[in-house]
């Protein structure tokens, strides 16, 4: 980002959230409304009650821009959790292909390059980076994203469904089985009726990625169903739990 672009970014930032982060005890950077709803509800759980007793600044920022807050975080010395998506190629559904895939997330690439300037930001390398706790910068910034422990998810919603149904993105079920899962769980997700312009019968195989593609326009409704059914603790992805646990320290 050029100096002019950075200046424009901070002009905009001052208008929307400067006072909130300056006076905060800690900060959570997140991508969208579903993350905000989920994290705010999670902070009411006994496990994370220390966070509810502090002034936490919530800053909405996409994966391409969260890295731009690094200098400000360091200047203010505010312990910050950046929650983002690993964003590998969505068509990858085999573990080996997933691990070879490259993230498109600019913030993850930026922070990964500090430790590994000459390495590609493949999913396999990023998993190892996180396992080595290199995603934590000076105990001040924690880059929080999905790993193999979240069923190889690439988004929050995938990680949540993987956790609740004890599955991986590589797993598939018949459409009829997904219908039963939705009925039993009372979770509000969509099941596609068509794939590649062909009607899907109840015996046809549907992946979790098909489910999320069909639900993409109703993510907020899905999140409300999680909250209203009291599933926040049981559906908590490991990557989010790890980030919130670190932030409490």
Positions of predicted regions on the chain:
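Acidic, Mg2+-coordinating catalytic modules of nucleic-acid enzymes
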Residues: 4-7, 11-29, 33-249
């Amino acid at each position: 980002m050029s100096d002019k672009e950075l200046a424009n970014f901070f002009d905009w930032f001052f208008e929307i959230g400067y006072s909130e982060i300056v006076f905060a005890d800690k900060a959570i950077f997140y991508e969208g409304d579903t993350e905000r709803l989920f994290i705010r509800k999670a902070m009411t759980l006994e496990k994370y009650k220390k966070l509810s007793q502090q002034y936490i600044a919530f800053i909405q920022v996409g994966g391409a821009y969260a890295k731009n807050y690094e200098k400000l975080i360091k200047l203010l010395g505010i312990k910050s959790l950046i929650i983002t998506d690993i964003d590998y190629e969505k068509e990858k559904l085999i573990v080996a292909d997933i691990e070879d895939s490259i993230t498109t997330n600019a913030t993850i690439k930026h922070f990964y390059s500090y430790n590994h300037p000459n390495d590609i930001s493949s999913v396999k390398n990023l998993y190892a980076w996180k396992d080595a706790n290199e995603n934590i910068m000076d105990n001040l910034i924690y880059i929080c994203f999905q790993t193999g422990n979240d069923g190889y998810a690439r988004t929050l919603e995938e990680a949540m469904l993987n956790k609740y149904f004890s599955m991986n993105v590589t797993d598939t079920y018949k459409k009829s089985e997904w219908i039963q899962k939705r009925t039993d769980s009372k979770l509000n997700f969509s099941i596609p009726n068509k794939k590649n312009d062909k009607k899907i019968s109840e015996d046809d195989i549907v992946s979790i990625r098909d489910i999320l593609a069909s639900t993409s326009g109703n993510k907020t409704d899905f999140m409300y169903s999680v909250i209203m059914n009291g599933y926040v603790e049981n559906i908590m992805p490991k990557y989010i739990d790890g980030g919130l646990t670190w932030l409490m320290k």
